[in-house]
Design a protein with these regions (language model features):
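C-terminal boundary/linker of central alpha/beta nucleotide-binding cores
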Residues: 1-37, 41-49, 89-106, 119-123
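C-terminal non-catalytic interaction modules
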Residues: 160, 170, 410-413, 417, ...
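Extended non-membrane alpha-helical scaffolds
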Residues: 152-169, 173-419, 423-426
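Short acidic-capped amphipathic helix/loop micro-motif used as an active-site/signal-coupling element
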Residues: 44-64, 85-88, 99-105, 119-130, ...
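Short, well-ordered secondary-structure microsegments
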Residues: 68-133, 141-154, 181-185, 189-192, ...
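Start-of-helix signal in alpha-solenoid helical-repeat scaffolds, especially tetratricopeptide repeats
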Residues: 20, 24, 48, 72-78, ...
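Specific register positions within alpha-helical solenoid repeats of the TPR/Sel1-like families, i.e.
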Residues: 55-59, 106, 110, 152, ...
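Short coil/turn linking the two alpha-helices of tandem helical-hairpin repeats
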Residues: 59, 92, 106-109, 133, ...
Length: 522
């Protein structure tokens, strides 16, 4: 009390336990006295060992305590953790203490979305572990998994990401550790699907189902359902995707500790609902898709990666697809803000790409193209991934509208080639439709016939995938062409046959556009 009264110690009384913190000047004075007494090394070691024990206790409590309560207790220790790790890996420190502390502190970094800090600390710890050192095998497994997760969300599906998850899985199998086998399989699935290797990702998903079959946690068995559902969506099987994703959404058991967020760096329920929102829009339920994406944001707020995923993969694109540009602007701003605050460059790059699409829809083509290039530059090696393809189509449309038709066709051809090579078939209908629209911009003989062929291919793809929204887009483009060619009866019959299958979403941009064309044809 006297030290507090003299302003040498600060008291923190914002919780059930009063905590005391030395002011910087007092801390510097104490360190000087310790050094002078010759006790600094011994005290610093005890300090590091104490916080190693603190975080090992925190690691065991993570899966049993409510997340907010756990974070309130241990989140305030982040500076002590950093200081202890700095000593442990210093020339006068003890790397073995540092390795143990780093492995135990992973839940704190993950839950606090300090992924870049996690990556650098984990890489430092791994550098001190000898290859094949059996005494540290379990800690190395945890560190490899943490490295894979932090790399995935900060740099994307780079080779180092896959290598980290592969090593973690190998160690987990050697230790017969089913928990880390599941985590590593999730990481490898995320790596392969992001990199466009769908068949490999499906094999990983099936393997995860096998491992999870004997687990006591029912949520573990839903991980494979989620994996398969997401794969089905991107491959173009929307009915199949919906079945798997709805099972996850319906059967998921919420727990206060929400340990799955740390285990898989995503809220499983929120992740399934984000993809389900996309499926609903594709199937012709834009209002349901919008409501699903909106409600998902609240569920995902507990974790920055989950929130960025919900925004980038569902809320932003669905707002753009439905033509709600005010909502799109809000979601894009939220995505850019959160990804910047938590140093998540991949999600920030996606935010720039969505911002570009928003500018393009508003007619600001120069800004849109500039933002698109900036987003592509920031994506770096992640441009090889499946999520890059729709952004290429945005660029192709903008280039065409800006009069750079040849460049636009080159961009859409690249998108179609990537789509075919990676089996990202969900967007093939829209790519073919855009190619047809770009062909019509050319003043060359035979372009109308070529465009019509592309529109009909787009219709076929959409119908095979039960993607009613893309079917409407293709039907609208083809009906407009038929109308321009003096074939209003054909145009009316085609467009009515698609438009009248919708039961909602009549105020969205595509349906308003289709209705306006139908009215003009009558």
């Amino acid at each position: 009390a006297n030290l507090v009264a003299k302003s040498l110690v600060a008291a923190e009384v914002d919780g059930p336990v009063t905590r005391y913190r030395l002011l910087d000047t007092a801390r510097a004075y104490a360190l000087e006295k310790l050094a002078g007494s010759g006790e600094l090394e011994a005290v610093t070691r005890r300090y590091a060992e104490y916080y190693r024990d603190v975080f090992e206790r925190a690691e065991t409590e993570w899966e049993t305590r409510p997340a907010t309560e756990w974070l309130a207790d241990y989140g305030r220790q982040i500076d002590n953790l950093r200081a202890a790790l700095d000593w442990a890996f210093s020339p006068d420190g003890d790397a073995s203490v540092g390795v143990a502390m780093t492995a135990a502190a992973v839940p704190l970094w993950m839950h606090s979305s300090l992924l870049d800090e996690c990556r650098t600390r984990v890489e430092r710890a791994l550098a001190t572990i000898k290859v094949g050192e059996t005494a540290n095998a379990r800690r190395e497994m945890k560190l490899r998994a943490a490295l894979g997760a932090s790399l995935l969300y900060t740099r994307g599906a780079v080779p180092e990401t896959g290598a980290a998850w592969t090593k973690a899985l190998k160690i987990a199998e050697s230790l017969d550790d089913a928990e880390y086998q599941l985590r590593s399989l999730w990481g490898l699935w995320s790596f392969h699907i992001t990199d466009g290797h769908y068949r490999v990702a499906l094999a990983v998903a099936q393997r995860s189902c096998t491992v999870a079959a004997n687990r006591s946690d029912p949520n573990d068995r839903l991980i494979g359902e989620h994996m398969v559902g997401v794969l089905r969506h991107y491959q173009g099987d929307q009915p199949g995707a919906r079945r798997h994703l709805e099972r996850v959404f319906t059967n998921y058991a919420t727990a206060d500790h929400r340990s799955h967020i740390m285990r898989f760096q995503i809220d499983l329920r929120a992740g399934a609902r984000a993809t389900l929102a996309r499926v609903l829009w594709l199937q012709g339920f834009p209002d349901q898709a919008t409501r699903t994406a909106e409600s998902n944001i609240e569920d995902a707020r507990a974790n920055a990666s989950s929130l960025c995923s919900a925004l980038a993969l569902a809320a932003c694109p669905i707002a753009l697809w439905t033509g709600d540009l005010t909502a799109a602007e809000s979601y894009v701003g939220m995505l850019l803000n959160r990804s910047t605050r938590h140093a998540l460059p991949i999600w920030h790059a996606f935010g720039l790409c969505h911002q570009a699409a928003l500018a393009i829809k508003r007619g600001d083509l120069n800004t849109g193209l500039w933002l698109q290039h900036a987003g592509f530059d920031d994506l770096g090696e992640a441009k090889t991934g499946f999520r890059f393809i729709p952004y290429l189509s945005d660029m192709a449309e903008a280039l065409g509208r800006a009069g750079q038709i040849a460049d636009g066709i080159a961009a859409i051809d690249e998108a179609i080639e990537r789509c075919e090579r990676t089996e990202v078939h969900w967007v093939m209908s829209e790519l073919l439709r855009i190619k047809g629209e770009l062909l019509l911009l050319q003043a060359a003989p035979g372009v109308a016939a070529a465009a019509e062929d592309h529109f009909r291919q787009a219709l076929d793809w959409a119908r095979r995938q039960s993607a009613l929204s893309f079917e409407l887009c293709a039907a609208t483009s083809l009906a407009q062409l038929q109308s321009d060619q003096g074939r209003p009866a054909d145009a009316m019959a085609l467009l009515q046959s698609v438009y009248h299958r919708f039961t909602e979403g009549f105020e969205t941009a595509d349906l308003r556009g289709a209705k306006a064309l139908l009215d003009a044809l009558q």
